[in-house]
């Protein structure tokens, strides 16, 4: 039996991954802030071990990760949040909230799990295709996910000689409680079940970078390669489609 560690396991992609891996017989360490949801996951599958902590509480995160109920070989860092800035009116408090979860929270978990990592392990970090192209109102979210992507790629360079692999995941729009809050068109949005399938398949293949859905993420990457003066017009047209 193999084991997987998942943060952000109380909703969305993380919850679906926890359920899917548990169905396949994996031992799952499901992490999140919502203790009742974690307990319900354990009720559904005895091989799901709940671990409650808040990634923004860095000492608490380190303490929670000091001893684990099993030894994972796969680590999926999925916890994150999204807030938007309206009309380009900078809000440093909002920026700090988003970065504290999406960037420093990832770093806190990495610091906590690092003593448990060894040769043959894989760490997957969930970013966003938003890091590849500037999108309206995404000053905080997009910048945080760009930072996460850089962090993951740098860790890949430093950890590969140690036999530890890193996968950076770049999802497009996925139907989750997080995207339910969006008030704009979300082209080519996919279900959380499909997103979990894409992630599991990509990690099983051992890819270093995983983009999905392919058509949408390819389009975003293509737009990101165009001259900047064209990008804004095309992005606004795409998000109104």
Question: Language-model segments: what does each one mean?
Answer:
Residues 86-97:
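Substrate-binding pocket helix/loop in short-chain dehydrogenase/reductase
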Residues 10-11:
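Conserved glycine-rich cofactor-binding loop
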Residues 24-40:
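Conserved glycine-rich Rossmann-like NAD(P)H-binding loop of the short-chain dehydrogenase/reductase
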Residues 110, 144:
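Active-site helix of classical SDR
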Residues 128:
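Residue(s) in the substrate-gating loop at a strand-loop-helix junction
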Residues 168, 184-219:
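C-terminal helical subdomain
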Residues 45-59:
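Rossmann-fold cofactor-recognition segment
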């Amino acid at each position: 039996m193999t084991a997987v560690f998942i943060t952000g396991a109380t909703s969305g992609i993380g919850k679906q991954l926890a359920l899917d891996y548990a169905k396949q017989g994996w031992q799952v360490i499901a992490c999140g802030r919502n203790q009742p949801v974690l307990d319900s996951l354990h009720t559904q599958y005895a091989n799901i071990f709940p671990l409650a902590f808040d990634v923004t509480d860095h000492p608490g995160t380190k303490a929670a990760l000091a001893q684990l109920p099993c030894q994972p070989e796969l680590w999926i860092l999925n916890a994150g949040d999204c807030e938007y800035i309206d009309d380009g009116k900078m809000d440093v408090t909002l920026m700090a909230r988003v970065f504290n979860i999406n960037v420093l929270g990832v770093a806190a978990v990495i610091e906590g799990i690092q003593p448990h990592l060894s040769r043959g392990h894989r760490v997957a970090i969930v970013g966003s295709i938003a890091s590849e192209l500037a999108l309206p109102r995404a000053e905080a979210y997009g910048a945080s996910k760009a930072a996460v992507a850089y962090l993951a790629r740098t860790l890949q360079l430093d950890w590969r000689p140690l036999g530890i692999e890193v996968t950076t995941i770049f999802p497009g729009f996925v139907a989750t409680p997080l995207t339910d809050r969006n008030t704009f068109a979300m082209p080519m949005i996919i279900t959380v079940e499909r997103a979990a399938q894409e992630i599991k398949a990509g990690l099983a293949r051992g890819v270093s970078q995983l983009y999905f859905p392919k058509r949408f993420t390819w389009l975003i990457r293509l737009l990101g390669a165009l001259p900047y003066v064209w990008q804004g017009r095309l992005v606004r047209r795409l998000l109104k489609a």
